[in-house]
Every structure is written in C-alpha cells, then in structure tokens.
Amino acid sequence: NTHLRLEADNFNLDGFDVAPGKKSKALVMTFKRPEEVVGNHIAKYQALRLSKMLMAYDFDRKLCAFAELGGFIFTFMGDGKPGTGKTTLIQMMAGMIDGYCKVAGYPFRYQNLGIDTVDSYQGKSGQNAKSFITSVMDPAVIGFGTIDDIDQVAGKRGERGSSAGQQEITAVLMEAFAGANTVVRGNCTFGMFSNYPENVDDALRQRAG
C-alpha cells in the first residue's frame, strides 16, 4: 500500500494499492531444465516450441509474427492424473522463457491464479482475476500466466456446488480468452491445468487452444 502526506494541508492518504503491472517482483521459482523432464515428450515439445514462439514478439510493433500469421497458442490446457508432471511442465516452461528473456534483455512476468483468488466478497474474485489477466497481458512484457487446478478456481455455470466467486472468475476468463475485445498480441500465453478437466465449464474448456 502507498502512504502519502500533504504537508501544506496536514492531510494523510493511506491504503492506495499500486496499479497491477506497475510494480514487479523478482521471480522466485524452482525451475526445471528440459533434460530433467522425463516422459510425456509431446507436451514437453509443445511447451518448448511455445517458449520460443514468445521470443518472436516485436516490442516496437507490439505484435508477434506467429500471432499475425497464425500458429500462436494463446491458451492451452494440461490435464492428467495426479503425479503425471503438470507442475513440472509449468516449472520447465517458466524456466525456459525466463532464460530466453534474460539473454534477450526482455522483461518477463509470470503469475499464477490460485485458489486464494476466490473471495467471499461480492465482485472481489472477478476483480482479482481481471488484475491477473491485465498483468500478464501487459504489452510491455513477455507474460506467462497459469491457472493451476482450474476446476477448483473457476466454477461451472449453473452448478449448485460452484460459489459466486468461482463463477465470477469463469466469466472473466471466458471474456479475456475469447471475448469480443480480446486482442492476441503474441507476447503472452495462458496455461490451464487440472486433474479433472471434465469439471471445468464446457465453454471455458473449449477456449483452451
């Protein structure tokens, strides 16, 4: 939070949050090298390919050649039984992009939308999800956003077990991934991961890839 004091008026301003994306923290994460990821060679190859695609982003034009010509993967879903390496794949891909960005001198931003995003206050969950999307899609950075255990974070519409907060997140993600105002510049990608993809809202699952 920001604290300001206007001496002339003897007036304090407290509690203003810095706008999302304006203040970046150093990425602290356990990275995995590609040679440490054994098995699941198709998913591994696709993750490596996507990491390289992101490096084709032109910061002057604010557009990636793959997004312009086709073939860019803006959203994807990784599913599988527990222990099949979904988190390892995230660590490998984030590590590859981070390494490439360091060599190229590009700013890299990684964020995860976790279960702690779901809030009991009306509208707050959707606001948290929107902040996550805005931060990752910032055209001034290379972004990688993940939604781990998306079946717990985003709720199925019309299902009695889904909270209002989960449904807000579903609505925000659907609008961001394939809404009327969605602009795919090719500077970022979003990965959704779940052990139970059948529990994810059908329309949201269809937006993966």
Predicted feature descriptions by range:
Residues 202-209:
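A short helix-turn-beta junction within AAA+ P-loop NTPase domains corresponding to the substrate/partner-engaging
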Residues 68-110, 134-135:
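Walker A/P-loop
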Residues 125-131, 158-188:
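Substrate-gripping "pore-loop 1 plus following alpha2 helix"
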Residues 107-139:
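Short glycine-rich substrate-engagement loop in P-loop NTPases that contacts/grips substrate
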Residues 149, 188-197:
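A short beta-strand-to-loop transition that corresponds to the Sensor-1 phosphate-sensing loop
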Residues 29-74:
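Pre-Walker A (pre-P-loop) alpha-helix and adjacent loop at the N terminus of AAA/AAA+ ATPase modules
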Residues 139-165:
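Conserved P-loop NTPase "ATPase switch" module shared by AAA+ and STAND
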Residues 1-30:
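Interdomain "pre-motor" coupling segment immediately N-terminal to P-loop NTPase/helicase cores
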